[in-house]
Amino acid sequence: MSELPQSNGQRLGVVAVFVENRLEAAPRVNAVLSEYAGIVVGRMGIPYRERNLSVVAVIVDGTNDEIGALTGKLGAIPGVSVKAALRKKNGGEAV
């Protein structure tokens, strides 16, 4: 299987979103993810009931600025913390 060419300035990565108060924060998280649908490749959400926490993994393909804006808006939501790992522009380990 061949690798798709990477557009100039585009980065592939995963954004981990930890949601502490799902009932209050989920609508805002979903609204932000919808706003950035153009860079979202896919997402998977897991409710971790034992810790009263939800974890969402979001695969993104966008510029550093777009991904930074997405993570900034998500991280500004009360009860939400975010961490992104991006693929190096030329491949290899995440930076």
Where are these regions (language model features)?
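Long, contiguous binding/interaction regions
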Residues: 1-95
